[in-house]
Amino acid sequence: MAKTKAGGSTKNGRDSAGRRLGQKIGDGQFALTGSIIYRQRGTRIYPGKNVGIGNDDSLFALVDGIVKFQKIRKRKYATVVMAK
């Protein structure tokens, strides 16, 4: 005999919240030093000039300037062109 009735579906119904990944500053927009440009899992986009990479693979600006995304040999790069 079953101790409880068949109620398996009520024990499912959970999901984790979205991780808010993706682009935070668009191409051509101004970024301040330390501001996050792109949040990612793994290196979907690689750091270019004046861009650092964090422990969680987030890309951030090392200088104040304009964000540029470019594709070089099948790899996407994020760079920051310094403001004058």
UniProtKB/Swiss-Prot annotation:
Domain of life per record: Bacteria
Key words, A-Z: Ribonucleoprotein, Ribosomal protein
MF (Gene Ontology): structural constituent of ribosome
Example of a GO cellular component annotation carried by this entry: cytosolic large ribosomal subunit
Stored PROSITE patterns: RIBOSOMAL_L27 (PS00831)
Residue numbers spanned by region Disordered: 1-22
InterPro entries according to UniProt: Ribosomal_bL27, Ribosomal_bL27_CS
Any Gene Ontology biological process: translation
The UniProt record lists the keyword Ribosomal protein: yes
Protein family (similarity comment): Belongs to the bacterial ribosomal protein bL27 family.
Protein name: Large ribosomal subunit protein bL27
Phylogenetic classification of the source organism: Bacteria, Bacillati, Mycoplasmatota, Mycoplasmoidales, Metamycoplasmataceae
Gene name in the database record: rpmA
